């Protein structure tokens, strides 16, 4: 866990495979009452989500927050667009970086920090298929090395 990071509720492992993460930014999320209850219960999916900047504001799109079971009529649309809380300086910096070709903003993880839901947004550039295969190959090699070291140290 990074410094100051709280309880991790959801991670986007697919984003680490599909993108080169250039930099990360922590942002707050504007949620309704029933949404925060679902988030605290870890009923959130980041897989297809992304962030975009419109009219000087940052928005989180396609992130699924399951309806709260006891929410009844107060449940919001699970796929609705949610506003991200960033400083103006951070938004302009990200907007300037997004002008580069192939750059996008992807949510990497959602966690609680001091009782507030935060999302770690990554400024990312898409990988080619051969880059993805290389990542998988490297991960498998590291796993095999750890397994062999564990077996070797058990003697």
From Swiss-Prot:
The keyword Cell membrane belongs to this UniProt entry's keyword annotation: no
GO molecular function: RNA binding
UniProt key word 4Fe-4S: no
Listed GO CC annotations: cytosol
Subcellular location: Cytoplasm
Principal subcellular localisation of the protein: cytoplasm
Gene Ontology process terms (BP): trans-translation
Keywords from the named record: Cytoplasm, RNA-binding
Family: Belongs to the SmpB family.
Annotated function: Required for rescue of stalled ribosomes mediated by trans-translation. Binds to transfer-messenger RNA (tmRNA), required for stable association of tmRNA with ribosomes. tmRNA and SmpB together mimic tRNA shape, replacing the anticodon stem-loop with SmpB. tmRNA is encoded by the ssrA gene; the 2 termini fold to resemble tRNA(Ala) and it encodes a 'tag peptide', a short internal open reading frame. During trans-translation Ala-aminoacylated tmRNA acts like a tRNA, entering the A-site of stalled ribosomes, displacing the stalled mRNA.
Protein name (database record): SsrA-binding protein
Organism encoding this protein: Streptococcus pyogenes serotype M18 (strain MGAS8232)
